[in-house]
């Protein structure tokens, strides 16, 4: 078995490539996906390889982006939402906490919003206090959400 070393950015890019290549229902949606300033090297050329209909760069609207992804997941799509700043995920709290986290239980297991949300913390040294919080532990306390991180 061949082993390969990855840094975080390359590992994320490799995982996204694998998912987009092997699962046609997967798409990635979020702000700044086509800009390395927003997402570093984690999205390099994915829009060119898989098309802008599967790597969707959105306007600044965390709530709308997250809500659209959750809705798409209910009809069989496998969306990945990228929030380039975890702090601004707070604008999407209704969609995350009151919808995605609860629907499976609210509808007797008939609705399974299978959405993955990736959030980026402190994209560099220039971020201020309101751009660099780590809210993982806070999200981990919400029933129905699964929080994973390296």
Where are these regions (language model features)?
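Thiamine diphosphate
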Residues: 1-150
